[in-house]
Amino acid sequence: MTIDSGFNHITVLLDEAVEALALRADGCYLDGTFGRGGHSRLILSKLGPQGRLLGFDKDPQAIATGQALAAEDGRFVIVQRSFAELGAEVAERGLHGKVSGVLLDLGVSSPQLDDPERGFSFLNDGPLDMRMNPGQGISAAEFIATAPVEEIARVFKEYGEERFAGRMARAVVERREKQPFTRTADLAEVLKVANPAWEKGKNPATRAFQGLRIHVNNELGDLEAGLEAALDALEVGGRLAVISFHSLEDRIVKLFMRKLVKGEADNLPRNLPVQHKVFEPKIKLIGKAQFASEAELKANPRSRSAVMRVAEKLR
């Protein structure tokens, strides 16, 4: 567990993820989602003097934590970029095709969720922001204030998997015409009233808030770009480990890996003359999908939805 600004963050699948990378003492590794550094610190503890670790994050608080770690350990560097830009960073550093392993731990961190000022939570009132990097892009409040009702409904349904998306979006637009939304509790209350069928044990604003967060941060677009960039960055034999926290993320990861296990021929027209290697898989899967253990679930209930998939680059 690491502690940051009074908020606890327990790294999910800590040992399992680092073990999945099959670390070499002199290898070069990328932590695409540094967060509060749980995975990075364990990786560094297992690297030798020649080993290197490059961390990525969009969150300014995560960057501050990473800079402190970099000052302590010269083998580590942190950059304030999305892992979707991993390819550009790797190319700038001359590391293309030389990376031994990439770790992506997706979603929002506990410090982000638990700090009301970040605007991610419907349980604790705060400014309606939701941006991983508050200095980049539009906030959730700006989106809610300007988007057409159809776009708001699409975000709730497509990214939040909210079945009452249309009804909830109409309630949001009706209310914003009288008074703009600036606080999370205000939006959560309108969503709560508009949701006619509450799920047992789940706040009625949960899915809509998830949809907003994913949209504001382009999380699924970043994931698709980041997976491609990570594979390109890896050396042959390098490993990619991805931890996802909801079905939309896991579906993208699963389909990406499944496509590469089959090779590229599935995407080509029939009877097209091709070289034999397009039938060869680009990756192999390492074991089955992994989930949090019973012990981890007891220690950290937020790990219940975590699933990790691991692949090794073949060519």
From Swiss-Prot:
<dbReference type="GO" id="GO:0005737">
    <property type="term" value="C:cytoplasm"/>
</dbReference>
<comment type="function">
    <text>Specifically methylates the N4 position of cytidine in position 1402 (C1402) of 16S rRNA.</text>
</comment>
<dbReference type="InterPro" id="IPR002903">
    <property type="entry name" value="RsmH"/>
</dbReference>
<feature type="binding site">
    <location>
        <position position="57"/>
    </location>
    <ligand>
        <name>S-adenosyl-L-methionine</name>
    </ligand>
</feature>
<comment type="similarity">
    <text>Belongs to the methyltransferase superfamily. RsmH family.</text>
</comment>
<protein>
    <recommendedName>
        <fullName>Ribosomal RNA small subunit methyltransferase H</fullName>
        <ecNumber>2.1.1.199</ecNumber>
    </recommendedName>
</protein>
<dbReference type="InterPro" id="IPR029063">
    <property type="entry name" value="SAM-dependent_MTases_sf"/>
</dbReference>
<dbReference type="Pfam" id="PF01795">
    <property type="entry name" value="Methyltransf_5"/>
</dbReference>
<keyword id="KW-0963">Cytoplasm</keyword>
<dbReference type="InterPro" id="IPR023397">
    <property type="entry name" value="SAM-dep_MeTrfase_MraW_recog"/>
</dbReference>
<feature type="binding site">
    <location>
        <position position="105"/>
    </location>
    <ligand>
        <name>S-adenosyl-L-methionine</name>
    </ligand>
</feature>
<feature type="binding site">
    <location>
        <begin position="37"/>
        <end position="39"/>
    </location>
    <ligand>
        <name>S-adenosyl-L-methionine</name>
    </ligand>
</feature>
<dbReference type="GO" id="GO:0070475">
    <property type="term" value="P:rRNA base methylation"/>
</dbReference>
<dbReference type="GO" id="GO:0071424">
    <property type="term" value="F:rRNA (cytosine-N4-)-methyltransferase activity"/>
</dbReference>
<keyword id="KW-0698">rRNA processing</keyword>
<feature type="binding site">
    <location>
        <position position="112"/>
    </location>
    <ligand>
        <name>S-adenosyl-L-methionine</name>
    </ligand>
</feature>
<keyword id="KW-0808">Transferase</keyword>
<feature type="binding site">
    <location>
        <position position="83"/>
    </location>
    <ligand>
        <name>S-adenosyl-L-methionine</name>
    </ligand>
</feature>
<keyword id="KW-0949">S-adenosyl-L-methionine</keyword>
<keyword id="KW-0489">Methyltransferase</keyword>
